[in-house]
């Protein structure tokens, strides 16, 4: 455990951010199975704006979602 006050605060902040990021990512995964296309794309875009995922990964996720759901609807 860190002894410096600012280090202790940074540990707390990074843990809080990690938990928030995990929640957002798991919510996106859940949406990909249960929600509509618009809801999925909106959640992915919000995650990019919050800095949770990189924009290139967001594009890949949207593309993967499109491919999997275009096959299932045919």
UniProtKB/Swiss-Prot annotation:
Record has Hydrolase as a keyword: no
TM region positions: none
Keyword RNA-binding among record annotations: yes
A biological process term (GO) from this entry: translation
Gene3D superfamilies per the UniProt record, alphabetical: Ribosomal protein S20
Compartments (UniProt record): Plastid, Chloroplast
Any single Pfam family the record assigns to this protein: Ribosomal_S20p
InterPro entries: Ribosomal_bS20, Ribosomal_bS20_sf
Gene Ontology CC: chloroplast; cytosol; small ribosomal subunit
Keywords: Chloroplast, Plastid, Ribonucleoprotein, Ribosomal protein, RNA-binding, rRNA-binding
Single annotated GO MF: structural constituent of ribosome
Family affiliation: Belongs to the bacterial ribosomal protein bS20 family.
HAMAP family associated with the record: Ribosomal_bS20
Record-linked PANTHER family: 30S RIBOSOMAL PROTEIN S20 (PTHR33398), SMALL RIBOSOMAL SUBUNIT PROTEIN BS20C (PTHR33398:SF1)
Record's function text: Binds directly to 16S ribosomal RNA.
Protein name stated in the entry: Small ribosomal subunit protein bS20c
Source organism: Cyanidioschyzon merolae (strain NIES-3377 / 10D) (Unicellular red alga)
Gene field: rps20
